[in-house]
């Protein structure tokens, strides 16, 4: 597994399965156990079963997991671990297999025996999946026999039965999510593939295979429906993969690991020439997007080590200090800790609360990173030079920020000249259209409902923030009006509570230039105002492509297919009826009434909300599309060209 092996404590049999409470509540309140009954909850069912298999891998008894999406969106998870115990569990007098799948908080994760580390959702995984499945079948290969149980919505439909002989060990779970419980029953292969790849990186040497066997996927190339992943380098390879579209400052990934008692910590990091930090932290294989004690320990140690090293080699004066943020500019880092009693804050495990892990990670990084820098002075100087440059840029950004604040304080609410604000002051009721060009801005201003709609026209070439530091952003005359109009600051100082509008709508033409402006703005929001996207405040307006007129009747269409359908409908079955069809060449060519009717009227318009389902994937996409490297961008365009909208103007 990791370079420091995680071993099982005691035997894994029925005595290690401890019952805490019943299953009744799960179907009543599924959100308490899997977060939601939306698509994310649907996928969470798979993660729970896979987590159980990974617990066997962590204990040193499993090196292969296979996940299949079968026809009908049935899931099958197979592992070659020891198999769930089938002997009688003393506390209940029932087979341990039955207890694991029918009793909440039953598993080898409680009571001091069984697993030392475990990632299952507070030990409720298997039974919750069972409760929320239309049907579930589990087969255990153990002691030369195949033991099978069947369930429906948490109830036993077939008692544990021996159905055959076997020469292997392991568990196979097959289940179909219950349509009574989930809004969406279709699995996204890429979502599952991303999660399985993550698990494979975090558990060096574990092979995870995922395959899409659904009929709708049969004609897809194998590269889009089957992946087999095994990374002997573990999180080292994870960092290399995360940095693949970036230019690394040093060729080797810095790897550090250590152990105290039953707790293990691994850290892998590499700097690149970009300006953004990417830190992914995990506890018992569970991603902790809000960080926690392991991240705190790492950040503190990194800042101290770099400052001490800088003073030692005289790149820093004794009274100089580089901030933690500057030390992390261009950093890609993966932190993985494994511990017995993981204390996650919140049911969704977003943050790790164990204070002893902060000390462990701090000590490991303080010791091993210091040694690395001593042995690799050239790399040390490059990292410090980057941090010092970031420090100078941050100071310039601070001065620019203070200058803006002073001007605002002297001149009142110094809103941008071109902003046409609305009358309403409640941000929950207001929206701002960020519009490309003065002509479209003029039509939008005349066509809007000024009670709640504000207009901010943008003009000229916008800054690509993927290639710029914060000081350049503050001084940029194209982005400054956006920052000022929204009123919530940027970067670490961004405060959603100060936002002046809760709908930020990007309105640009449906051509190449419009797409470029949209992408530049989204890159800016992602890098400097990410909570804006995370809170669901960012939208893209979808203007129509066609106007169809018959006499005094006018309709619009958003695609070629819709144009043909609307045209046929307006003819009413008479092919001789004349329909005038014109194509909107751009927002600037629409008159104010047309713009209101098609793109701004809340009753009729189409808005596309920008979401952030996968921050890592979004990070990678922005780096590819807007970064310095040409080759990854070329590959991305070639791979995704089939999904692009056909633009002929």
Descriptions of predicted regions:
Residues 1-13, 23, 47, 55-57, ...:
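GHKL-family ATPase ATP-binding module
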Residues 15-28:
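Mature N-terminal segment immediately following signal peptide/propeptide cleavage
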Residues 28-47:
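Conserved short strand/loop->alpha-helix "switch" segment adjacent to the catalytic nucleotide/phosphoryl-transfer site
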Residues 392-411, 426-431, 442, 446-448, ...:
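C-terminal interaction appendages of subunits in large macromolecular complexes
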Residues 84-107:
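Short conserved segment of the HATPase_c
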Residues 55-56, 83-84, 512-513:
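Residues immediately C-terminal
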